[in-house]
Amino acid sequence: SPVKSGLFFYMKVSIQGVKGSFHHLVTVNYFSSFELNECSTFDELVKSIIDEDSEYGVMAIENSIAGSILPNYALIDEYNLSITGEYSLSIDHNLMCLPGQSIDEIDEVHSHPMALLQCTKFFTKYPKIKLIESEDTALFAKKIGENKINGVGAIASKEAADIYLSLIHISEPTRPFH
């Protein structure tokens, strides 16, 4: 159960993804104080709640472009979980790579399939860049940064770039990256 610390409750919150992911951004904005439990999959996130390793989980269930995320609704139903809150996050996709590289030096870009789909129009200007699907937006940014992979970019949040990489194209709310 949550531990009371001053005026705030300190709790363990599971997310699918890593720091800098959109689930992490929701967690930071929604909870006043928390310990983050990074999960590889939504199944792992649900297991952490069922096993009482976490008090809460942050899970996307709607996407304004793709609609309902039915597999996540199925997990909620299958494990009889309750939705206890809601947070709407405006998603801004940003292109990032190792510091010092330019977009002309990028041969491939990795990200979640939905992020790649939403940025397709932008990449028509860069036909040499191969788009490659990965399981999470921020996770591949982390991998590029940790392994110092040259010539490879990621599409993720600005916060992921702040943690792991360097921005080379910033999404602007009035002129979306996609």
Where do the language-model regions lie?
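A conserved helix-loop-strand patch within extracytoplasmic ligand-binding domains
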Residues: 78-139
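Short N-terminal binding/cap micro-motifs at the start of the first secondary-structure element
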Residues: 21-25, 44
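Short helix-initiation/N-cap motifs at beta->coil->alpha
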Residues: 37-50, 132-143
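Paired acidic/hydrophobic, glycine-rich loop segments that form the ligand-binding mouth/hinge
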Residues: 55-59, 150-156
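Single conserved hydrophobic/aromatic residue that forms the stacking wall/gate
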Residues: 169-178
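Positively charged N-terminal leader segments that act as targeting/secretion signals
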Residues: 1-8
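Short, well-ordered beta-strand elements
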Residues: 11-17, 107-110
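Short, glycine-/small- and polar/acidic-enriched structural segments
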Residues: 44-102
